[in-house]
UniProtKB/Swiss-Prot annotation:
Keyword Protease in annotation: yes
The name this protein goes by in its record: Tripeptidyl-peptidase sed2
Cofactor annotation comment: Binds 1 Ca(2+) ion per subunit.
GO biological process: proteolysis
A cellular-component GO term for this protein: extracellular region
Active site per database record: E288 (charge relay system), D292 (charge relay system), S503 (charge relay system)
Cofactor: Ca(2+)
Gene: sed2
Keyword list, A-Z: Calcium, Glycoprotein, Hydrolase, Metal-binding, Protease, Secreted, Serine protease, Signal, Virulence, Zymogen
Length: 602
């Protein structure tokens, strides 16, 4: 034991010596303070700061291969998900050399408050020490409109011996934030009254579904019928709340009374991370959280539902569609995912719905890839990660922010991450059509996965040379599927409202996946897990193909017909719905009866 400690000490000493003797190199750098921000003041060298380092993972390729095998319905390993955080991390742990190198570098700077967490190293220090360590210049910057302050640096450096082991250090050079994927809440139309709507629901009357969506509309439209889940069968579903939004117990009770009488009495649990709250009296916006909760309960009741409430604000590179980081608040993916991944298997929800997003180009590539990798890790634990595709159609700010100022159809993040299932939007019911704001397109960061290759190639062949140069034809295509995205009846702060957006689509589809998991668990089968390989193969016949309508965008305005944003106009830009997969509605909307039959065959 003593000998091993001596060896470790010697190694740390050597690492420290090497780290300090090799010139540091710039690891990340901004050319200027991002748009919408300005210098506020310089912190004291004694001010505290907390940073975390993402270490390079040992066998990412092997991990991704294992995940694809357990998600492929034709593979013998289908459904054999990792059962613990430790088992899942086994292939992703950094090398001992990486851990010792980075830790030694920190300790040589006098930093002692260090936490090793698998492939992350987190530490607390002071601004003065951080500046010296990273050759940085941390200052306080303030948003010019919202007056939100952030402690950031425009550049930081790492010694060469450390840089080779590191993916990123955060928070450092990134300023930023975003919005939920829904339109501004509007009061109920004159022709829709809560009591009249409730009477229609009680009578099973769905004649008003083109004007207002209720859970019964979705149950009828998506062929759920009288399927009854078992609340004790093991299926669990969750939704993520950010930006100080909290679902309300009273609103859920009123929703159940008026619009989902079969769910009366069902409640939800709340798990809080990173200072997230469960404030039932907040004057802040609660619409997104209430929407997610009410339609997950309304469609999947009585399956248990959890809200993950995560505090904090995330990271952004501003572009024209999100110039004001206070108005467009970026959710703290890292804090949320690191905590959820550590949950015990018997408590981990097998479906997590998230209705937030942003332009892919506003996210630093290293950060985006690290977060997408965390979603893959959830998939390996048997979790279906569901995201709304976005509400900017073809795009809102159709201009690159990399200095080239090219006209471009901007993909969405995390919707274009290949390890999530992205849900676009439809409208009307007889038949359904693609809704104009349903985001879709092709990632600039991720190549197209093999599981969607043939479906997307068929679409691209039909598209031909149209829009050539405005999108990446080799990128991961999204959305994967779609669901209704307009006119959802939601109770918020005691009042009936209607919401639009793919924020509506994601919880509706998530609830259907939770029902599929319920059926599989009751038949002693594993849960669905990462869905996409199954969706594009065995399940492709379980969707209603949407062939009318299309998404629009690139009209020089912010999403939902908003204010001018100064970006280029692409006349008649649109992704049209068509036979097979398309960038407006993916594979189509779910037919639960068909999907249930297909899901039970393996």
């Amino acid at each position: 034991m003593f000998s091993s400690l001596l060896n470790r000490g010697a190694l740390l000493a050597v690492v420290s010596l090497l780290s300090s003797s090799v010139a540091a190199e710039v690891f990340e750098k901004l050319s200027a303070v991002p748009q919408g921000w300005k210098y506020s003041h310089t912190p004291s060298d004694r001010d505290p700061i907390r940073l975390q380092i993402a270490l390079k993972q040992h066998d990412v390729e092997g991990f991704e291969t294992a995940l694809l095998e357990m998600s492929d319905p034709y593979h013998p390993n289908y459904g054999k998900h990792f059962q613990t955080h430790e088992e899942m991390k086994r292939m992703l742990l950094p090398t001992q050399e990486a851990v010792e190198s980075v830790r030694g570098w920190l300790e040589s700077a006098g930093i002692s408050d260090i936490e090793e967490d698998a492939d992350w190293i987190k530490f607390r220090t002071t601004v003065g020490v951080a500046n010296d360590l990273l050759d940085a210049d941390f200052k306080w910057y303030v948003n010019e409109v919202g007056h939100v302050e952030r402690l950031r640096t425009l550049a930081y450096s790492l010694p060469q011996s450390v840089a080779s082991h590191v993916n990123m250090v955060q928070p450092t050079t990134r300023f930023g934030q975003i919005k939920p994927n829904r339109a501004t809440m509007r009061g109920r139309p004159v022709q829709v009254d809560a009591d009249i709507l409730s009477a229609a629901v009680q009578a099973g009357d769905t004649s008003t579904c083109d004007q207002v969506i209720t859970p019964q509309c979705l149950k009828d439209l998506y062929n759920i019928g009288d399927y009854k889940a078992d609340p004790n069968g093991g299926s669990k579903v969750a939704f993520a709340s950010f930006l100080e939004e909290y679902a309300r117990y009273d609103d859920l009770a009123k929703f159940e009374e008026k619009l989902a009488p079969y769910a009366i009495g069902q409640n939800f649990s709340v798990i809080q991370y990173n200072g997230g709250l469960n404030d039932q009296n907040s004057a802040s916006d609660s619409g997104e959280a209430n929407l997610d909760l009410q339609y997950i309960v309304g469609v999947s009741s009585p399956i248990p539902v959890t809200e993950f409430s995560t505090g904090g604000r995330g990271l952004l590179i501003p572009d024209l569609s999100q110039p004001d980081p206070n108005d467009n608040s970026n959710e703290p993916y890292l804090e949320f995912l690191q905590n959820v991944l550590k949950m015990d298997q018997d408590k981990l929800p097998q479906v997590i719905s998230t209705s937030y997003g942003e332009d892919e180009q506003t996210i630093p590539e290293k950060y985006a890839r690290s977060v997408c990798n965390l979603y893959a890790q959830l998939g390996s634990r048997g979790v279906s990660v569901i995201f709304s595709s976005g509400d900017s159609g073809v795009g809102a700010a159709c201009l690159t922010n990399d200095g080239t100022n090219r006209t471009h159809f901007p993909p969405q993040f995390p919707a274009a991450c290949p390890w999530v299932t992205s849900v676009g939007g439809t409208t009307k019911t007889q038949p359904e059509e693609a809704v104009y704001f349903s985001s879709g397109g092709f990632s600039d960061l991720w190549e197209r996965p093999s599981w969607q290759d043939s479906a997307v190639k068929r679409y691209l062949k039909k598209l031909g040379p149209r829009y050539k140069g405005l999108y990446n034809p080799k990128g991961r295509a999204f959305p994967d599927v779609a669901a209704q995205a307009e006119n959802y009846a939601v109770f918020d702060k005691g009042v009936l409202h209607q919401f639009d957006g793919t924020s509506c689509s994601a919880p509706a589809f998530s609830a259907i996946v939770a029902l599929l998991n319920d059926a599989r668990l009751r038949a002693h089968k594993p849960v669905m897990g990462f869905l996409n390989p199954w969706l594009y193969s065995k399940a492709s016949k379980g969707f209603n193909d949407i062939v009318k309508g299309g998404s629009k965008g690139c009209d020089g305005r912010n999403r939902f017909g908003g204010t001018p944003n100064g970006s280029p106009v692409v006349p008649y830009a649109s992704w049209n719905a068509t036979d097979g997969w398309d960038p407006a509605t993916g594979l189509g909307t779910p037919d639960f009866g068909k999907l249930l039959s297909l899901a039970m065959r393996r």
